[in-house]
Amino acid sequence: MRAFMEPMDVGLKAQELSGKYENVVLSRTNDHVVRISRMTEPYFWHLHPDSDETFLGVEGVLILELEHQRIELGPGQMITVPKGTRHRTSPAGSHSINLTFERAEIETVRTDPPAL
């Protein structure tokens, strides 16, 4: 028997987020998840040795810092960070909200910041 399906309002889910950092699974697809994240301060430098990570901006501006590059991701913009790439994210203003597409059992390895 087929499961009952209903569309999800991502905008309403975004309004439910209020903490400094929240990262909530919205959906599962095979061995991947779609998460919605709200952040008000920078996340630590890290990498994922086993999975790419795709970000889709929903609200505000998400700053993606790589070793030699800084990218600003606005609502509706998307980027994929290849596995093994050291990076960190932070909001450009008071907060940012984004969707993240990644393996459900993604490994996160904390790293030192890149040398200046």
Where are these regions (language model features)?
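Structural motif
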Residues: 33, 42, 61-63, 70, ...
